[in-house]
A protein has these predicted regions:
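Hydrophobic alpha-helical transmembrane segments
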Residues: 1-140, 145-206
């Protein structure tokens, strides 16, 4: 095998591994779309459960940093973590749960649902779409692609329209979510997107 073929094989393996990690990570994002339905039936118990999950994850991730593995949680974290998170505290799940909790506490149910859906589907599918189909990188966005941004736009457009049934509001929310997603916020987009989109939907639906 030539050096070029060997290098190509390594790159292909790295690409497949990154897609696998992205699928695991974004499947967790998408599952958060179930939370608004749970909140409808048991608001405070769900908030309490999310808080417990948040505290438990922080504790398990802290232990993992010190070489103590917590069954299931530490394994999922290692499987889903990005290369930039290796040997670091993986912050994504913390901001994900915080984003859901803060959105649910701040906004009325319909607006909170729209915000959480923007997180679950818009942000959840954007990076996956970018990795699978992204060819053109948008300047000054730390690697964000046109494909990823369009995925975010259409995901939020559809999910918000499913809730509010208003084309203008849905379009405004989708454009706003796409704009926020372009900002290189790192893991804090999990917090900013649902809170901001929930707040904007509150203003637009008055």
């Amino acid at each position: 095998m030539s050096a070029d073929e060997n290098r190509a094989g390594i790159l292909q393996a790295q690409y497949k591994n990154s897609i696998k990690k992205e699928l695991v990570r974004k499947s967790i994002h998408i599952c958060s779309a179930l939370i608004p339905s749970f909140l409808t039936f048991a608001y405070w118990p769900v908030i309490a459960c999310l808080t417990v999950v948040l505290v438990f994850y922080i504790a398990s991730e802290t232990l993992r940093k010190y070489g103590i593995s917590v069954p299931v949680v530490s394994h999922i974290t290692e499987v889903a973590s990005r290369k930039r998170d290796e040997n670091k505290f993986v912050l994504g799940p913390v901001t994900l749960v915080l984003g859901i909790i803060v959105t649910a506490l701040l906004w009325k149910p319909e607006a909170a649902r729209i915000g959480i859906y923007a997180l679950a589907f818009g942000d959840g599918l954007a990076s996956l779409g970018g990795k699978l189909f992204g060819r053109t990188v948008i300047p000054f966005t730390h690697g964000k692609t046109i494909a990823g941004s369009l995925t975010c736009f259409f995901a939020v457009l559809c999910s918000s329209f499913a809730v509010c049934k208003n084309g203008f509001v849905s379009l405004a929310l989708a454009l706003s979510a796409m704009a926020i997603e372009l900002i290189p916020l790192g893991d804090f987009d999990n917090l900013v997107i649902p809170v901001a989109i929930g707040g904007l939907s509150t203003l637009l639906m008055r």
